[in-house]
Swiss-Prot record:
InterPro entries: KH_dom-like_a/b, RbfA, RbfA_dom_sf, Ribosome-bd_factorA_CS. Keywords: Cytoplasm, Ribosome biogenesis. One of its GO terms (molecular function) is ribosomal small subunit binding. Disulfide bonds: none annotated. It is found in: Cytoplasm. One of several proteins that assist in the late maturation steps of the functional core of the 30S ribosomal subunit. Associates with free 30S ribosomal subunits (but not with 30S subunits that are part of 70S ribosomes or polysomes). Required for efficient processing of 16S rRNA. May interact with the 5'-terminal helix region of 16S rRNA. This is Ribosome-binding factor A. GO terms for biological process: maturation of SSU-rRNA. One of its GO terms (cellular component) is cytosol. Gene3D superfamilies: 3.30.300.20. Its main location: cytoplasm.
């Protein structure tokens, strides 16, 4: 189930999705252009695959992943340290009534996809997929 869906199965509103995409583009642009002067952030390429907005659009959960999946904790700490600056930059680039507060989280989807791939390659699953029956 995508992160934007509530446990009841309702999908996120189109406005939340649109604003989340605008914030995602703004954060990704700031990070890619070297707008934050931090040694950790300057030495890492950071992808921003998703931003999830709260219903009132005042809180943005920004999912990030350093390229290569290494040094997640230092990158997250550096982003947290500069979150006020990033919030101000997002406010300048995205026209909203309130600048959303940014919360940074590591995107776990890549690790989860790799774990599932590894499970699918196990002999027991390969046997099930090929249609062989146990006797």
């Amino acid at each position: 189930m995508p992160r934007n869906e509530k446990k009841t199965g309702q999908s996120a509103s189109p406005r939340k999705l649109r604003v989340g995409e605008l914030v995602r583009h703004a954060v990704a642009e700031i990070l890619s252009q070297g707008g934050v002067h931090d040694p950790v952030l300057e030495t890492h390429l950071i992808t921003v695959p998703e931003v999830r907005m709260s219903p009132d659009l005042k809180l943005a959960t920004v999912y990030v992943m350093p390229l290569g999946g290494k040094d997640e904790k230092p990158v997250l700490a550096a982003l947290e340290q500069h979150k006020r600056f990033l919030r101000g930059e997002v406010a300048r680039r995205v026209n909203l009534k309130y600048a959303p507060d940014l919360r940074f989280r590591i995107d776990e989807r890549f690790a989860e996809a790799e774990r599932i791939e590894k499970l699918l390659r196990t002999p027991a699953v390969q046997k099930d997929l090929s249609g062989e029956e146990e006797t």
